[in-house]
Amino acid sequence: MPEKVIELSHISVFFNQDGQTLKAVNDVSLDVEKGDIYGVVGYSGAGKSTLVRVINLLQRPTAGKVVVNGETLFEKTDQSTAIIEAKKLRPKRREIGMIFQHFNLLDEKTVIQNVEFALKHRKLKEKQITAKAQELLELVGLGDRGQAYPAQLSGGQQQRVAIARALANDPEILISDEATSALDPKNTVQILELLKRLNRELNLTVVLITHEMDAVKRIANKVAVMSEGQIVERGTLLDIFTNAQFPLTKKLVGTESDSQKAMAILKNDHAFDNQADQSILHLTYRGSSISEPVTTKLYEDFSVETSIVYGNVDVLRDTPVGTLFVIMTGAKNGRQQAIQYLKAHDVTVTEVGLEAVKND
Ligand SMILES: Nc1ncnc2c1ncn2[C@@H]1O[C@H](COP(=O)(O)OP(=O)(O)OP(=O)(O)O)[C@@H](O)[C@H]1O
């Protein structure tokens, strides 16, 4: 059984704003397992930051239960409220590192002093603190920049220092709240790859809050989509990308734009006669499970012709995932058998109604 490191149950966070109740987080439950890189995505104001601030009780919930590494930090029921004692919460918080969009480094201190600062509370000798800080800088690829000042570093390098500092107390969990939002594309990719490496090498569990689906696509294994204080859809990265149900998810993952492009092509496509012997299919598949021989096979075995209207390939973590919109022409029975064949070969098949083409 995978070990649950974060268990949020029925969390609500309500704020009072000008006499009105703002439901920033509304009855959200979320479990994160050891070694996950759990992407929490949604537009600004969806409640992502508020939800993750609950994990280490930087934000106290209005209702719900917070368990980290098996220990209950907070539980509020109708009858009572239980909160972990302050002296126990402090070390618990150290199990959870955080990085943000703003790096929050101390400008007047050198890079290594910034990292050492996070180790000061430990009963370590000066020398040990310096050695540990140096080790952390090496881990994030900045072993030779310890004597520089933050202003002398690029944004990406400053975020690396912030990551080294967040790891100073050997946390099991790292919360990344929009950590790449202020970075250019190159630095964004480098920071995401660093998080992926730390996840792999240190078995660090990462909660990745972002409004950028590309970030999630690159490193997350699981995704929760938030809208108006609630999780509207969740699943493995592959599920969310190949089988999104909620309109916002479709928009975020690009299914909506793929579908719009395919429909625009179909409207002007003479191969599509809108006849009773034709189906429009939306296929998604992993790796290279669909290739030329498949269309040949469908023709030979089921007497259906498959013509590709639109295709796109995304890379999820390291796996290519393809999207195809095809017109399948042939007898109803043959088309049904061909669809069964595709499904049996790990292809997700969705029939697109003809209305979609007419009304789009
Ligand atoms: N301390 C607070 N007091 C009052 N309202 C708050 C407070 N913190 C957050 N909110 C409100 O709660 C809602 C959710 O905010 P939150 O920051 O969690 O969203 P988000 O999805 O992280 O978006 P962003 O990326 O813009 O921060 C917003 O409407 C915000 O204005």
Where are the language model's segments positioned?
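A short, surface-exposed alpha-helical micro-motif characterized by mixed small hydrophobic
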Residues: 216-218
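The feature captures the beta-strand-to-loop junction immediately N-terminal to the Walker
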Residues: 41-43
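Conserved ABC ATPase "signature" region
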Residues: 72-75, 116, 120, 127-144
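ABC ATPase NBD coupling module
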Residues: 73-97, 121, 240-244
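Helix-to-loop junction immediately C-terminal to a conserved catalytic motif
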Residues: 56
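Conserved signature/switch motifs of ABC ATPase nucleotide-binding domains
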Residues: 148-151, 168-169
